[in-house]
């Protein structure tokens, strides 16, 4: 489970959050 800089888990089905999470992972 990757974690976004804000502390939000990337493991979610919310498309917008996945987008932000993917950006944070890069």
Swiss-Prot record:
GO cellular component terms, semicolon-separated: mitochondrion
Known EC number: 2.3.1.9
UniProt keyword Transferase, yes or no: yes
Post-translational modification remark: Succinylation, adjacent to a coenzyme A binding site. Desuccinylated by SIRT5.
GO molecular function: acetyl-CoA C-acetyltransferase activity
Catalytic center residues: 21
Keyword check for Mitochondrion: yes
Subcellular location: Mitochondrion
Reactions accelerated catalytically: 2 acetyl-CoA = acetoacetyl-CoA + CoA
Top-rank taxon: Eukaryota
Keywords, ordered alphabetically: Acyltransferase, Mitochondrion, Transferase
Quaternary structure note: Homotetramer.
Family stated for the protein in its record: Belongs to the thiolase-like superfamily. Thiolase family.
Protein name: Acetyl-CoA acetyltransferase
């Amino acid at each position: 489970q990757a974690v976004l800089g804000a502390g939000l888990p990337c493991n979610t089905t919310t498309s917008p959050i996945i987008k932000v999470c993917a950006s944070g992972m890069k």
